[in-house]
UniProtKB/Swiss-Prot annotation:
This is Receptor-type tyrosine-protein phosphatase alpha. Residues 241-501, 533-791 form the Tyrosine-protein phosphatase domain. Integrin binding to extracellular matrix induces phosphorylation at Tyr-798 which induces PTPRA localization and recruitment of BCAR3, BCAR1 and CRK to focal adhesions. One of its GO terms (cellular component) is focal adhesion. It comes from Homo sapiens (Human). The modification Phosphoserine is found at residues 211, 213. Residues 20-151 are extracellular. The chain crosses the membrane at residues 152-174. Residues 79-115, 123-141 have a biased composition (Polar residues). Part of a complex comprised of PTPRA, BCAR1, BCAR3 (via SH2 domain), and SRC. Within the complex, interacts (when phosphorylated on Tyr-798) with BCAR3 (via SH2 domain). Interacts with GRB2. The modification Phosphotyrosine is found at residue 798.
Length: 802
């Protein structure tokens, strides 16, 4: 029996005894006295009216109920008092005795108190005997005195009872709190995230422990406190975030993994320490004659307000691909979310469980590829699956969509949550309402998988309750699958994604709504002097430039290679060129890789070469096989050099091992096209490079219309299709303002053509995270919107969107 239950019984007993003693009055009283003497002899009790209590050592009040009733162990207690006659000091003594009440109301001690304990006296005698005495009923004066004492004793007993009750309550609270912290007990009800309780049979499964909404160290956060709290917890190298993550329970319940641990199933597990719990694992339909064929390393996971919204699974192994597709079919899944690459750091993370093209049969499931769309952060594959077997009773086909997030780095987490939020939005929009659980997997099915699940749930909670409970939700889903959200970096990334969504929201637009949006953002915002467009750009300029992540560009040897000291590439995406033999610090050029719509590193955003960096510029072009150069500045503007001429006006010119020859020059309406033959004399190889020199950008401001920009973007994309999708080198003077505007427009227009959707704000925001000051002015930002609107108006295919 639990200790707290024993305390309840004990306390109840004490209260009952105390209550009985305090509320009964008898006509006759038996008094027991301790006598300080070497021999115990009877002594007459003398009536002391002046101080009746001084002569009483123990007072027992007889109950009024029927005579000849035996009370069961009762405690007689003697209290210290001084005898005014003989100066003896009486010491407290407690004895367990049985007492019989005689018909005349006198006390008849059983066995003459033979079990009474003796204790040393505090008086002068060397030895002391404790001798209980029985006194006959005294006269009326004694009875009156004792009646006067009864209310005092009743008050004392009542106070003692109250103290006992308070003590028991405190002990029970402490025991209960301790049990909650240990979180090891079973529960007979399942606490859903929306507050409903679903009853289950006792002892059937270990269920989720409830997380109290109050009295918790990491309670839910209101969204308006999110930014402040994240900044506080990220201080001192994420110290508080690490503490919060480490406080998460590894498993809030006592769960078993018996099925996963069977010898027949061990080979089906990718990692020996990542096993599904028995109570939440996905059960496959057993295959006749195949033992333990109901097992797969996958677990049901709750969403915010939806039970078993997800199935968290490990990345299939070669020997479990058939089981994976069997699970997809049996669970009526329509959406698969993959958050790993097939190989990372040369290690297999997941078997390819789909054909590249055509169809393939996995067990009794035929999978055919219907469509593949490759984007910068993820790939979307559409499969048609069908159960095969009895050809006379063919099952209907089903459409399965796989969303494969490809931007998760081998180490850590994505440097920005923008891509993950776009990915998640696409998953939410495409999963049919009728479908079964969404299958989410990475390699182990816990780290990145858990991160995706938590972001999804917390975005739902944010919209519904205007608060988030990351700690509580991670704790709950860890009771369904171990180690969900595996690292503190993933835990911080969840908060960053939530903050990103809270601060900037969903800024995607259908092309049909662009005109209305433009009218709206030109209106003044109440309470401010800015319109909506100015507020958008203000948010962009508030993005912190990470000067501490520009180490190489700030080295003394490289400072002279920078045209503008405020625009230096970040370390994580700077373009690296081969080091010259015997020369240090020769791998630097002021240029950054920039992601496009469909692929990473689509562009190289570079400053206009200085005279002493032309060789480095061409070494970069050669090393990264760039076949298209976009120049957005004149060599000189307003009497200042903006870019050194890095190509010959005619003939050829050498820059170190690189020679450049002008083969052809053609003037177009707003730009010049130059075909250059570039040769690496050391490698004895040549390449054709095409330069697009845009003349439509005035020295001050922006182009008068977007026609020229639309034209040059189309020409560059055509060149890319012919020469291969190597990076497009884009430069102006500093490689930020006009360069960023070109990259933004090229990316936005490509998405408009593919999806009919645009997001100018997030596109520019992403550029600024990759290189400082991309799209440098409000005019340039506004120009992006105007060019997109012109593009939609100019092309009939997109004019139909209206």
């Amino acid at each position: 029996m639990d200790s707290w239950f024993i305390l309840v019984l004990l306390g109840s007993g004490l209260i009952c005894v105390s209550a009985n003693n305090a509320t009964t009055v008898a006509p006759s009283v038996g008094i027991t006295r301790l006598i300080n003497s070497s021999t115990a002899e009877p002594v007459k009790e003398e009536a002391k009216t002046s101080n009746p209590t001084s002569s009483l050592t123990s007072l027992s009040v007889a109950p009024t109920f029927s005579p000849n009733i035996t009370l069961g162990p009762t405690y007689l207690t003697t209290v210290n008092s001084s005898d005014s006659d003989n100066g003896t000091t009486r010491t407290a003594s407690t004895n367990s005795i049985g007492i019989t009440i005689s018909p005349n109301g006198t006390w008849l001690p059983d066995n003459q108190f033979t079990d009474a304990r003796t204790e040393p006296w505090e008086g002068n005698s060397s030895t002391a005997a404790t001798t209980p005495e029985t006194f006959p009923p005294s006269g009326n004066s004694d009875s009156k005195d004792r009646r006067d004492e009864t209310p005092i004793i009743a008050v004392m007993v009542a106070l003692s009872s109250l103290l006992v009750i308070v003590f028991i309550i405190i002990v029970l609270y402490m025991l209960r709190f301790k049990k909650y912290k240990q979180a090891g007990s079973h529960s007979n009800s399942f606490r859903l995230s929306n507050g409903r309780t679903e009853d289950v049979e006792p002892q059937s499964v270990p269920l989720l422990a409830r997380s109290p909404s109050t009295n918790r160290k990491y309670p839910p956060l209101p969204v308006d406190k999110l930014e402040e709290e994240i900044n506080r917890r990220m201080a001192d190298d994420n110290k508080l975030f690490r503490e919060e993550f480490n406080a998460l329970p590894a498993c809030p319940i006592q769960a078993t993994c018996e099925a996963a641990s069977k010898e027949e199933n061990k080979e089906k597990n990718r990692y020996v320490n990542i096993l599904p719990y028995d109570h939440s694992r996905v059960h496959l339909t057993p295959v006749e004659g195949v033992p333990d064929s109901d097992y797969i390393n996958a677990s049901f996971i709750n969403g915010y307000q939806e039970k078993n919204k997800f199935i968290a699974a490990q990345g299939p192994k070669e020997e479990t691909v058939n089981d994976f597709w069997r699970m997809i079919w049996e669970q009526n899944t329509a959406t698969i979310v993959m958050v790993t690459n097939l190989k990372e750091r040369k290690e297999c993370k997941c078997a390819q469980y789909w054909p590249d093209q055509g169809c393939w049969t996995y067990g009794n499931i035929r999978v055919s590829v219907e469509d593949v769309t490759v984007l910068v952060d993820y790939t979307v594959r559409k499969f048609c699956i069908q159960q095969v077997g009895d050809m006379t009773n063919r099952k209907p086909q089903r459409l399965i969509t796989q969303f494969h997030f490809t931007s998760w780095p081998d180490f850590g987490v994505p440097f920005t949550p923008i891509g993950m939020l776009k990915f998640l939005k696409k998953v939410k929009a495409c999963n049919p309402q009728y479908a079964g659980a969404i299958v989410v997997h990475c390699s182990a099915g816990v780290g990145r998988t858990g991160t995706f699940v938590v972001i999804d749930a917390m975005l739902d909670m944010m919209h519904t309750e205007r608060k988030v409970d990351v700690y509580g939700f991670v704790s709950r889903i860890r009771a369904q699958r171990c180690q969900m959200v595996q690292t503190d970096m993933q835990y911080v990334f969840i908060y960053q994604a939530l903050l990103e969504h809270y601060l900037y929201g969903d800024t995607e637009l259908e092309v049909t709504s662009l005109e209305t949006h433009l009218q709206k953002i030109y209106n003044k915002i109440p309470g401010t002097s800015n319109n909506g467009l100015e507020e958008e750009f203000k948010k962009l300029t508030s993005i912190k430039i990470q000067n501490d992540k520009m180490r190489t560009g700030n080295l003394p040897a490289n400072m002279k290679k920078n045209r503008v000291l405020q625009i230096i590439p970040y370390e994580f995406n700077r373009v690296i060129i081969p080091v010259k033999r015997g020369e240090e610090n020769t791998d630097y050029v002021n240029a950054s890789f920039i992601d496009g719509y469909r692929q990473k590193d689509s562009y190289i955003a570079s400053q206009g070469p200085l005279l002493h960096t032309i060789e480095d510029f061409w070494r970069m072009i050669w090393e990264w096989k760039s076949c298209s150069i976009v120049m957005l500045t004149e060599l000189e503007e307003r009497g200042q050099e903006k870019c050194a001429q890095y190509w010959p006006s005619d003939g050829l010119v050498s820059y170190g091992d690189i020679t450049v020859e002008l083969k052809k020059e053609e003037e177009c309406e707003s730009y010049t096209v130059r075909d250059l033959l570039v040769t690496n004399t050391r490698e004895n190889k040549s390449r054709q490079i095409r330069q697009f020199h845009f003349h439509g950008w005035p020295e001050v401001g922006i182009p008068s219309d977007g026609k020229g920009m639309i034209s040059i973007i189309a020409a560059v994309q055509k060149q890319q299709q012919q020469s291969g999708n190597h990076p497009i080198t884009v430069h102006c003077s500093a490689g930020a303002g006009r360069t960023g505007t070109f990259c933004a427009l090229s990316t936005v227009l490509e998405r408009v053509k593919a999806e009919g959707i645009l997001d100018v704000f997030q596109t520019v925001k992403s550029l600024r995270l990759q290189r400082p000051h991309m799209v440098q002015t409000l005019e340039q930002y506004e120009f992006c919107y105007k060019v997109v609107q012109e593009y939609i108006d100019a092309f009939s295919d997109y004019a139909n969107f209206k």
